[in-house]
């Protein structure tokens, strides 16, 4: 049993960094606060722990449970040393010039009806152009042009799909599948019945046994389309099974190429665990090796040039924001909390992986800080805190008064101050964007979240295993999705009036589904480690309790089925044609769900961030692209 060692804490060393940048720029506003961190009688409590142990004894004789996790991977000195030349105005001017040139390419496509574009492939060229700018992460510059292109394509859409060009009578699987996916994602009404027309007499998608590049392209786009299925769309389920099988078999026979790399990426990341910036980084490499799209090389090169430049310009922004986050983490006293998982850099990678808009610094930084606080609370309630301490902390959060720290144990005082100041500062930032006070709204969400944590701590303390229904109802709240999303999205320059917020946040179906996916997927990746730490309750164990005789494999199959069904429901809530809430208002919440799904794709990449998650940080945040 390891013993908590006592390390002196220098006087006034715990400083509180301003928790926010403004919406449009980073500001280094610092405010000192006293004795922040995990402090006991003027000293910092440092837990010395081995990954093979589950308990530790503190200096006051309290036996505490500890987690199995590695320390922070990213040294602050390293982060502060990062630099990039791409913040210079000359690069922004070059990007502006390229944006104008790409708009000219779009404009040439819009003249198709006038005969300047070939009537045999103009529809495919419109779709390929939109697909490319979106996957390259530069679509924010061309929203008007994208709408013109999609309106044009949609004007030729039929119940049998479309051909590659406006004068082509026979519909084409490749163009139809690509069009279906892009049109649905942009809110156009399209039905999956179009794919029935590509089946043979046996009810299967008609294709030859040969793995030609053209046929693979068609099946690849069919697979991508199948991933945005709505509930009850059987033809989409069939298309996903068929196309996934076809692509996996094709990968075994075709040589390694840009095509095979694209296939592997789409199979690996699909849609609900795909991070836009990772896709951009990967697709730039793929296009650079000549991809399977139908555009002319001159256009590809122009798009690539802009995409690389934009990637590196944002890379310079990432470095500045990383420095801000790392300073905040260090000066908040968080390093003294050695019993928690320090994943602030990993969370920033997720935030910048789903939002590459330069002016959205406040969103990215808010998301990271809230996720860090969620981690602190998770590790206190799950492992380190005693029941008496947790009840005191829960009561203090409900009263929401800085003076409440006087009733808390020393190590909790700093945590409470960070939480209190962060939530209040985010509310002030949200007021700038939304024009109203949202603090009480955020506090209610936080109280609900803390209450769910306390209930789980009580279950652990009692050794109680709830029913699946009881566990899942509470687990959707304790997943943290709502609390990680709410305040960050309110800092955006997107209006969230009360009626729209209620369609995204609690008690909306959209919020429930996003929380459900995180709870279900998280449990499938964490239940064994949680069980080893003494936490009985998980979706897996509760399912097995409700279904005597069932195995872990049975439970996992059931949970994975629930996840697939829930993803389809979330697709519907985001993209439903009768939606009164714009897709843009729901997109950040939806993308946060994708980011968390990505984190748990193979394992608990949150607790164990030294493998795939570390590679993600390097590939999308630390490394610039060669120009």
UniProtKB/Swiss-Prot annotation:
Q: Name one GO biological process term.
A: diterpenoid biosynthetic process
Query: Would you name any one GO CC term?
Result: chloroplast
What Gene3D superfamilies does this protein map onto?
Farnesyl Diphosphate Synthase, Terpene synthase, N-terminal domain
- The UniProt annotation puts motif DDXXD motif at 378-382
Please list the residues that bind Mg(2+) 2: 378, 382
Keyword Chloroplast (UniProt): yes
Q: In its UniProt entry, what is this protein called? A: (+)-sabinene synthase, chloroplastic
The source organism is Picea sitchensis (Sitka spruce)
């Amino acid at each position: 049993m390891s013993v908590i060692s006592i390390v002196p804490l220098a006087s006034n060393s715990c400083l509180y960094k301003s928790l926010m940048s403004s919406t449009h720029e980073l500001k280094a506003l610092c405010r000192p606060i006293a004795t922040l961190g995990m402090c006991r009688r003027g000293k910092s409590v440092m837990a010395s722990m081995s990954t093979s142990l589950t308990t530790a004894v503190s200096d006051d004789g309290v036996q505490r449970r500890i987690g199995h996790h590695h320390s922070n991977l990213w040294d602050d000195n390293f982060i502060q040393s990062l630099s990039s030349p791409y913040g210079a105005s000359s690069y922004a001017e070059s990007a502006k010039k390229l944006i104008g040139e790409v708009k000219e390419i779009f404009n040439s496509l819009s003249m198709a009806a006038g005969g300047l574009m070939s009537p045999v492939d103009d529809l495919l060229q419109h779709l390929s152009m939109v697909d490319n700018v979106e996957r390259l992460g530069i679509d924010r510059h061309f929203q008007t042009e994208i709408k013109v292109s999609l309106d044009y394509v949609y004007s030729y859409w039929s119940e049998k799909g479309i051909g590659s060009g406006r004068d082509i009578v026979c519909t084409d699987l490749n163009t139809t599948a690509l069009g279906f996916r892009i049109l649905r994602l942009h809110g156009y009404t399209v039905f999956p019945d179009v794919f029935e027309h590509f089946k043979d007499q046996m009810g299967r998608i008609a294709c030859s046994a040969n793995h030609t590049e053209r046929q693979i392209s068609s099946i690849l786009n069919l697979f991508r389309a199948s991933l945005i299925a709505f509930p009850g769309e059987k033809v989409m389920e069939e298309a996903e099974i068929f196309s996934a099988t076809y692509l996996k078999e094709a990968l075994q026979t075709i040589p390694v190429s840009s095509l095979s790399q694209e296939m592997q990426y789409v199979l690996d990341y699909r849609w609900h665990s795909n991070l836009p910036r990772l896709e951009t980084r990967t697709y730039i490499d793929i296009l650079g090796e000549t991809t399977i799209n139908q555009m002319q090389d001159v256009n590809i090169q122009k798009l690539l040039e802009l995409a690389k430049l934009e990637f590196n310009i944002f890379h310079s922004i990432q470095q500045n924001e990383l420095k801000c986050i790392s300073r905040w983490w260090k000066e908040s006293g968080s390093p003294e909390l050695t019993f928690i998982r320090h994943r602030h850099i990993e969370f920033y990678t997720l935030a910048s992986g789903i939002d590459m808009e330069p002016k959205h610094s406040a969103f990215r930084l808010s998301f990271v800080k809230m996720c860090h606080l969620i981690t602190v609370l998770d590790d206190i309630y799950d492992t380190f805190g005693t029941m008496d301490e947790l009840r005191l902390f829960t009561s203090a959060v409900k009263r929401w008064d800085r003076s409440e720290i006087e009733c808390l144990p020393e190590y909790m005082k700093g945590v409470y101050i960070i939480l209190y100041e962060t939530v209040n500062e985010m509310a002030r930032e949200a007021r700038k964007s939304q024009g109203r006070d949202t603090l009480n709204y955020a506090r209610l969400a936080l109280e609900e979240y803390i209450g769910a944590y306390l209930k789980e701590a009580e279950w652990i303390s009692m050794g109680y295993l709830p029913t699946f229904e009881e566990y899942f109802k509470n687990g959707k709240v304790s997943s943290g999705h709502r609390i990680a999303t709410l305040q960050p999205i309110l800092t955006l320059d997107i209006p969230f009036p009360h009626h729209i917020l209620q369609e995204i946040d609690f008690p909306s179906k959209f919020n429930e589904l996003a929380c459900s996916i995180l709870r279900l997927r998280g449990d499938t990746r964490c239940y064994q480690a949680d069980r080893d730490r003494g936490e009985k309750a998980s979706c897996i164990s509760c399912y097995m309790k409700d279904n005597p005789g069932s195995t872990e494999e049975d439970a996992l199959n059931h949970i994975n089925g629930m996840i697939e069904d829930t993803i389809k429901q979330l697709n519907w809530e985001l993209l439903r044609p009768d939606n009164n809430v714009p897709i843009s208002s729901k997109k950040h919440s939806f993308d946060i769900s994708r980011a968390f799904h990505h984190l748990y794709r193979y394992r608990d990449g949150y607790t164990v961030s030294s493998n795939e998650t570390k590679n993600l940080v390097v590939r999308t945040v630390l490394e610039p692209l060669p120009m």
